[in-house]
Amino acid sequence: MKKGLIMANHRIDRVGMEIKREVNEILRLRVNDPRVQDVTITDVQMLGDLSMAKVFYTIHSTLASDNQKAQIGLEKATGTIKRELGKNLTMYKIPDLQFVKDESIEYGNKIDEMLRNLDKKD
């Protein structure tokens, strides 16, 4: 039983990594929307039944308006992305995609800045 669970989790991780790679490629080559030009997919988390993928992204801008535009652009491009995934992946059903801004990079940068400021005070 335990081995089957490990194998299932490994497959979920593999599918997530493949979707991450493919979505990055699709955004770069197939989606012509300027709102998603600077978007990079950082992680994909799959539901256990592979019916949904939570796609985490970052954008190379700190402006709130750019972040909002990127989210809207990704939501508009979801149909194109799913269609391209269907062509490139050998899956029975392509999962639904939910795009979520990855806050971890900004959080890490904020911590780095705080640490640098501490060093300057000493």
UniProtKB/Swiss-Prot annotation:
Keyword Cytoplasm: yes
InterPro entries: KH_dom-like_a/b, RbfA, RbfA_dom_sf, Ribosome-bd_factorA_CS
GO molecular function: ribosomal small subunit binding
Keywords: Cytoplasm, Ribosome biogenesis
Localization per Swiss-Prot or TrEMBL: Cytoplasm
GO terms, biological process: maturation of SSU-rRNA
Protein origin, superkingdom: Bacteria
Keyword Oxidoreductase: no
Gene Ontology cellular component terms for the protein in this record: cytosol
One Pfam family from the record: RBFA
SUPFAM superfamilies attached to this UniProt entry: Ribosome-binding factor A, RbfA
Similarity comment text for this entry: Belongs to the RbfA family.
HAMAP family membership: RbfA
Subunit structure: Monomer. Binds 30S ribosomal subunits, but not 50S ribosomal subunits or 70S ribosomes.
Function: One of several proteins that assist in the late maturation steps of the functional core of the 30S ribosomal subunit. Associates with free 30S ribosomal subunits (but not with 30S subunits that are part of 70S ribosomes or polysomes). Required for efficient processing of 16S rRNA. May interact with the 5'-terminal helix region of 16S rRNA.
The protein's name in its UniProt record: Ribosome-binding factor A
Organism of origin: Streptococcus agalactiae serotype V (strain ATCC BAA-611 / 2603 V/R)
Gene behind this protein: rbfA
